[in-house]
Amino acid sequence: MVGISWMREGPFGVMVHWTSRIMPQSGTPEPDWNTRVDSFPVEEFADTLLRVGAKWLIFTCGHCGDAFCAPNSAIERYFPGHCSSRDLIAELGSALHCRGLKLIVYFQTEIDHESEAMRIAFGWDLDPRDKTVFQCRWMEVLRAYSEQWGFLVDGWWFDSCYDSKEKTFLRTHGAGWDNSRFNVSEWFGAARAGNALVLVAMNSGVAKDRHTCVFPEFEDYLAGESNDLSIRPGNTELQDGKQWHGLVWLDCFWGHFEKSGIIEPPRYSDDQLLDYLGECKRHKGAVTFNIGIYEDGTLAEATMAQLERLGRTLKKI
């Protein structure tokens, strides 16, 4: 696990859900996606992460909406007009690497909740269970991004790797599609087409009592989605020696999606987070904190102040 040592040794990472649904701090959202993406302050954003002590970033490229923050030849072929002109992911990767930080890209593996137009374009609705056409088209998208970004991206965090019968929130709950939809070797081949060393995790949803892999033979670290601080590496059996990783939201529930306004304050005290981080680090676990971000690319001030305090404290330990 030499290639993942940066995750094991770093104090923590930061995840943000910056998508077409993200709301501003005040006023109404900017309706033009290209204008939003063009306005994202990459250098200032990277400086903020460096200042608070984060060692990696997980950033969304498409999530709960049909807008993507980087151009993609396959998307343009099947679903034109939904990619930004600016390659925000490539610019983030470059800015982070210049500061010694790493970039992991969030990417969804199903589009059940997306617009009908998007589902038709990629063949999602052709059959309630058989997702072969969708998988072929979606792997073209993944491969195109992987080859486009190359070594600017250090990892993938793939979401929605689950059985539809287990998730009542799905539009097609009970339809019967599940992880058998993946041609596993081809999927991971597409993910690593541009960078054979890229790290990969597959997320099956919020864990109940332990984090696990979906395809242990192919994954490098645990996706680790959690809604609280209860799951820790000390009481979690590692699966096939994969890097333990916990991902917890700190303020708004995964994203500032509901309405314009100030993002909620941190829900944990400094001592609670230090206790969690301390135990995870003692067992060589990695931790990512999801924090709120506004439409203009600025981060929740109270949460960032808390992370900055944590970063200073961890340096003294």
Task: Report each predicted region and the residues it spans.
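Mature catalytic domains of secreted/periplasmic carbohydrate-active enzymes
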Residues: 1-317
